[in-house]
Amino acid sequence: MALAIVTSIAFACSSDSTRPVPPAGPKFSALLPIEAGQVIGAATYAAGDSSTGGQGAPVDGIACDTTTPIQHIHVHLTLIANGQQRAIPIAIGVGNPFILQNFVVAAGCYYWLHTHDATGIIHVEAPVATTFNLGQFFAIWGQPLSSSNVAGFTGSVTAYVDSTQYTGDLGAIDFQERQQITLIVGTVPDTIPLYAFPADY
């Protein structure tokens, strides 16, 4: 009887030692500082909306105007494609921008979702208190957004909202204050960067 128990324990231990261990998920960096006007990532895209983007016309009910916002929040977007972080360009959603020290300081009009620089920070400045999403931002930018194509980079797409993996419709990611959205096309890096928003944001 004792021999049978010992044999069973030994078998169980042996089985546990050969059981495959699931791969560990990526790590997330300590919060990295952001300075206004900084370029975060490789310059990959031209400034502003693409030819299929907003270009001043209303997009999904979002206007390019100069109305006073009653909602003002900030979201950070990181895009990593083919193993390299790509800069989200300056002046997305900005008509006739005036740029000083790599920062949009004035414009003919602003979409309610726009970028002032190439840090990856999306500014939500709207005259209405409502929820906006990532799909609307990409529509203003004029870039594709799907489970197999992000801003022209194709392949398997992995998404994180803050440090939690997101598996739903990418376009349906709702913007929340100081949220961090990471889109990865291809291999997920060992460490995913997270950022500290500037103190005055």
Predicted regions mapped to residue ranges:
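Bacterial N-terminal signal peptides that target proteins for export
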Residues: M1-A2
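C-terminal motif of bacterial Sec signal peptides marking the signal peptidase cleavage site
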Residues: I9-A12
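Short, conserved catalytic or interaction motifs in soluble domains
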Residues: S15
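Ubiquitin-like/PB1-type beta-grasp interaction modules and other compact soluble beta-rich domains
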Residues: T18-Y201
